[in-house]
UniProtKB/Swiss-Prot annotation:
Its EC number is 7.1.1.-. This is NADH-quinone oxidoreductase subunit D. One of its GO terms (molecular function) is NADH:ubiquinone reductase (non-electrogenic) activity. It is a peripheral membrane protein. NDH-1 shuttles electrons from NADH, via FMN and iron-sulfur (Fe-S) centers, to quinones in the respiratory chain. The immediate electron acceptor for the enzyme in this species is believed to be ubiquinone. Couples the redox reaction to proton translocation (for every two electrons transferred, four hydrogen ions are translocated across the cytoplasmic membrane), and thus conserves the redox energy in a proton gradient. It comes from Syntrophobacter fumaroxidans (strain DSM 10017 / MPOB). It is found in: Cell inner membrane.
Length: 373
């Protein structure tokens, strides 16, 4: 070929588009990678493909009408965001909640947390080449969805919480299903450990890979299991207890190295801690009403503002609501954990191999729709 048709090679850096769709993420993520051979020299995440305008919708709807949106921010832990929004509005309006409703919310929230972690576990291991654990995890997750479906009527987007309580009460079948599942999942731990935790290939793919230092975590606002894997024992349920979490005995799993393996171990141990919370809540479940019937249908909180933080499956999330005394919020802002968890990767991916990028992205457990919202 004549030389005039050949572009001169002036540098060794070239750009690779990872995405905008990739199995290691939930949703549409695009990462621009500048590569020097097999090594990443720069990573630039591009977000916004899934923007739906949830915050603006929240400001143009009644407080109650925004409830279905909250389950669709992070659709893998929709109950947790639904729960957090209701708690924020109740704090803003000064609404008391019956103890039974608080316990029911907590039980369902922890089931939703386990379901989210199981989906992450199955898909992450499959990204690294392990197909069998994926089937095991989804089988167990399916049973949680059946439990939540029994009481909420939905398997993914729940909208079960109400201002002042919950939509309907639980029955003995729910508690029996919950206790049976606790026994079943605990009997599965040896299988998961044998297939994954002690798998030498999995260990080599994750140990020392994608290290997040405590300084980087603080700088980028990393929260949740990714923060605790760095050795920082911060969990909103312990640091700023809400609902009835201060009545339960549970531990905060932490790592030491901040690598992908520690992030895996922290999430795995968190599932056991959630089982402990559910067990204690079932044993102490009080009687009485499940709903405060004095809450008006057309709620008008007094003028004021509230910032309410809670622990979602991916870290600390929060609602900032401003009321001007009307049935709709003047301002509705949502803090999501995946935003900080994503952008710390601009530092973490630098200097790593392209082959490790998938392992690192998957270990952080991103849900892109909650970032774009």
């Amino acid at each position: 070929m004549p030389k005039r048709f050949l572009a001169p090679v002036t540098e060794q850096i070239y750009t690779l588009n990872l995405g905008p769709q990739h199995p290691s993420t939930h949703g549409v993520l695009r990462v621009l990678l500048d590569l020097d051979g097999e090594f990443i020299v720069k990573a630039d995440p591009v977000i916004g493909y899934g923007h739906r305008g949830h915050e603006k919708m929240g400001e143009n709807r009644l407080f109650k009408q925004f409830l279905p949106n909250t389950s669709r921010l992070d659709y893998l832990s929709g109950f947790l965001f639904n729960h957090g929004y209701v708690l924020a509005v109740e704090k803003l309006a000064g609404i008391p909640v019956p103890p039974r409703a608080q316990f029911i919310r907590t039980i369902c929230s922890e089931f939703n947390r386990i379901a989210s972690h199981l989906l992450w576990f199955g898909t992450y291991v499959m990204d690294l080449g392990g197909f069998t654990p994926f089937l095991y995890a989804f089988d167990d997750r399916e049973r949680i969805l059946d439990i939540l479906d029994w009481v909420t009527g939905s398997r993914l987007t729940y909208s079960y919480c109400r201002f002042g309580g919950v939509d309907r009460d639980i029955d003995t079948r729910f508690t029996d299903m919950a206790r049976d599942f606790i026994k079943r999942l605990r009997s599965r731990w040896p299988d998961y450990h044998n297939l994954v935790t002690r798998n030498i290939i999995f260990i080599h793919r994750t140990r020392g890979v994608g290290v997040i230092t405590p300084e980087q975590a603080r700088q980028f606002g990393v929260t949740g299991p990714n923060l605790r894997a760095c050795g920082i024992a911060f969990d909103t349920r312990k640091a700023e207890p809400y609902e009835v979490y201060d009545q339960f005995d549970f531990e905060i799993p932490v790592g030491s190295d901040g690598d992908a393996l520690d992030r895996y171990r922290v999430r795995f141990e968190e599932m056991e801690q959630s089982l402990r919370i559910i067990e204690q809540a079932l044993d102490r479940l009080p009687g009485g009403p499940f709903m405060n019937d004095s809450v008006p249908t057309r709620l008008k909180p007094p003028k004021g503002e509230v910032y309410f933080a809670f622990e979602s499956a991916r870290g600390q999330a929060a609602y900032y609501l401003v009321s001007d005394g009307t049935p709709s919020p003047y301002r509705c802002h949502i803090r999501v954990p995946s935003f900080g968890n994503l952008h710390v990767l601009t530092e973490v991916l630098r200097g790593t191999l392209v082959a490790d990028a998938i392992s690192i992205l998957g270990s952080v457990d991103l849900v892109i729709p909650e970032i774009d919202r």
